[in-house]
Amino acid sequence: ARIESLILEKGVEDALARAHAFVAAGADGIMIHSRKKTPDEIFEFCDKFRAENTTTPIVVVPTSYNATTEAELAAHGINLVIYANQLTRSAFPAMQQTAEDILRYHRAKEVDDRLMPIKQIITLIDEL
């Protein structure tokens, strides 16, 4: 169950009430969100939730508090970390630079050193 209480600035107590209600209704896990640059309110929520519920998985998406380590998150009872858009956001500048270089040089040779070999891509597909 996804809880947006912290994003809506309704506070930790509202988030906790919702989390406990969702678990009572059969939720398999709790995903708690925050836009804050520090994990303080996430940690407060997790510590209070864990004081009453030690088994329901807690999921976080630390996009805004990205300096927080997985070990720090785990220390507060968080079970799953989702890196929601970091791969897409890092891939786009590389694709943009490659496209610009192809346009600049009117060919693809200058981007060869940045390309993954086709054989390696095929190997990845075979593993799936």
Residue spans for each PLM region:
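Extended, intrinsically disordered, low-complexity segments
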Residues: 86-128
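Alpha/beta enzyme core
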Residues: 1-83, 89-100
